[in-house]
């Protein structure tokens, strides 16, 4: 698989906030909005949020980026009201969090493209993966299933029909190379490459760890894969609350601004 065609979408993130075109820096009640906190995982998600924060500052909006090192805490912080938005996850992950925690988080927009890929320090294709190799995948429900689905698309395993990104190890119906599937916290996956043959790694951790997509990656999710598209999330109660929430001003102005991360 050639990776050059993926370089632009991987390294250029576009996060559209409706703040361009604002005539002033006050909300509809005539008050200057207080500090708005947006949660993001370290790496490209936080970089995009920081770039947006600079643009928001021009509109009189104090957007503070709160960085997290794991996948679960940003949603907990949002559900608890400690932050007002977060930008780091795909819809299935958010929906699973809602189901597991009885929360009501909703997506209000798309942010950046973050494909998961298969990475290795020793092999360059699925065909090169040796018999009995240890293969690492994320240990959270949706991204773990996403990793298994990617292994299936690469032809390394076969899964039960229809399971998709909801797959678990129990859904593997064929494993011709007798791969040993090891589930690890997503943030640990880049470091695991010294100990495993292949790891299915989300792109934000690929970039934050400084992995080389072209040299270490050999199979990537397609650009139109729904779970590769990240979202901007808020609490359901705040979704349309432009007048009473300080961050409503972010979405109440005409136009949008695109932030490029290279």
Q: Regions from the language model: what does each represent?
A:
Residues 141-166, 248-262:
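Ligand-binding clefts/hinges and TM-proximal coupling segments of bilobed small-molecule sensing domains
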Residues 1-35:
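Short, low-complexity disordered leader/linker segments with a strong preference
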Residues 65-76, 164-191:
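Short helix-initiation/N-cap motifs at beta->coil->alpha
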Residues 110-119, 207-244, 248, 262:
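Periplasmic-binding protein-like
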Residues 31-43, 61-67, 134-135:
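Short, well-ordered beta-strand elements
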Residues 96-108, 122-123, 195, 200, ...:
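Ligand-binding "clamshell"
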Residues 108-157:
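A conserved helix-loop-strand patch within extracytoplasmic ligand-binding domains
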Residues 43, 69-71, 81-95, 112, ...:
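Beta->alpha turn/N-cap motifs
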């Amino acid at each position: 698989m050639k990776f050059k065609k993926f370089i632009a979408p991987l390294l250029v993130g576009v996060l559209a906030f409706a703040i361009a075109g604002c005539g002033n820096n006050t909300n509809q009640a005539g008050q200057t909005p207080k500090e708005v906190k947006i949660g993001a995982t370290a790496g490209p998600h936080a970089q995009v949020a920081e770039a947006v924060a600079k643009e928001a500052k021009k509109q009189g909006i104090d957007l503070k980026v709160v960085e997290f090192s794991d996948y679960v805490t940003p949603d907990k912080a949002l559900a608890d009201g400690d932050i007002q938005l977060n930008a780091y996850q795909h819809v299935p992950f958010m929906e699973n969090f809602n189901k597991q925690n009885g929360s009501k988080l909703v997506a209000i927009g798309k942010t950046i493209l973050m494909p998961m890929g298969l990475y290795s320090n020793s092999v360059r294709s699925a065909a090169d993966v040796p018999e009995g190799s240890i293969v690492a995948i994320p240990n959270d429900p949706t991204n773990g299933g996403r990793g298994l689905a990617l292994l299936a698309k690469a032809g390394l395993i076969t899964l039960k029909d229809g399971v998709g990104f909801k797959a678990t190890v129990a859904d593997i119906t064929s494993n011709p190379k007798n791969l040993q599937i090891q589930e690890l916290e997503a943030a640990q996956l880049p470091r695991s490459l010294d100990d495993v043959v292949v790891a299915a790694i989300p792109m934000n951790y690929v970039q934050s760890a400084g992995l080389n997509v072209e040299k270490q990656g050999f199979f990537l999710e397609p650009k139109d894969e729904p779970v590769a598209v990240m979202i901007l999330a808020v609490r359901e109660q705040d979704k349309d609350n432009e007048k009473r929430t300080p961050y409503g001003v972010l979405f109440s102005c005409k136009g949008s601004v695109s932030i490029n991360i290279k």
